[in-house]
Amino acid sequence: MKSPWISGLRSVSLTVPDLAAAETFYTQTWGLTVADRSWGTIYFRGSGNDHHLLALHEADGTPQLRLVTLRARSAAALDHIAQAAVAAGGTVERRGAAADPAGGSVLLIRDPDGRRIEVVHGDAQRANDAPVPKDQPIRLAHAVLNSHAVEATREFFEKALGFVLADRTRIMAFMNCDNDHHTIALGDTDNDALNHVAFLMPTLDAVMRGGGRLKDFGLPPQWGPGRHGPGDNAFNYFVDPFGIVIEYTAEIEQIDETYQAGRPEDWTWPTGRIDQWGIGQMPTDHLKQAQRRVLFMPQLD
């Protein structure tokens, strides 16, 4: 179940109204490290190979999602995606050298509903020769994007980017591009906001310790801890100081071509439970509201 063109999710780029406060939170509490900075922008990395996994740009008002960056398997994949995206109803906004410090060649596309997806190849990657810190995110695990028309959005990701449906629940389509069960998921809602971004932690213990660290900071879990059905991953959800939903996750299921996609009737829960464990905080109203408020930026600077 691999995309022939996309190998994974590299990073997300968002705006925040207070960059200094964001740096403090994401380094001292969330566990990232500053990889680079430029005027009005900070790039954060985890312990993995990616040059950065989060780019935050200072801008007034409610946070907005600038773009989601996927990594291409080859330079030739960029050519194929450019053609396939247009054939699937999308547009190509830019092709050329990357504007961020990771470098490489990029293709920037928009789907028919305006979601901005960047695909990069040849970007800088760090040597992975140091011990993994026990409580630091390694890389991004997935991003969940809301969609008012999930099946149409799913079709675009399949045709333009080569994603494959891993599982379909009543409220979400889980999209696969490599060994991780899902890299993108599409939430069945009435808007097209960013639902959340998930950061992969090295262990279940790291997910739990991270939850304690956030609670000490004054941000208790807004959902969890728990273990999902599709993906079988442990989770802890939080809303950051700016209203962005972020997740610690670990132990995501690894799948291959033999995996059979589940249907909504395959993923049901007893009354009062929406995950395998059923012991953690149920999704709060604060979380549900935050999952609808971070929209894609209409135009890049």
Where are these regions (language model features)?
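Internal, well-ordered alpha-helical scaffold/interface segments
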Residues: E151, E155, K159, A173, ...
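A short, polar/proline- and glycine-enriched secondary-structure boundary/capping micro-motif
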Residues: T33, R66, D129-P131, E257-Q260
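N-terminal beta-strand motif that seeds the catalytic metal site of vicinal oxygen chelate
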Residues: M1-A20, L65-L70, G122-E151, V164, ...
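Active-site-adjacent scaffolding segments
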Residues: T41-H52, H57-A143, M172-A173
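Conserved short beta-strand elements that form part of the metal-binding/catalytic scaffold
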Residues: L32-L65, R115-D123, A166-N195, L200-L204, ...
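Vicinal oxygen chelate
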Residues: T15-A20, T69-D113, H148-E151, F199-I246, ...
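Core segments of cupin and vicinal oxygen chelate
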Residues: P4-H51, A99, L145-H182, G187
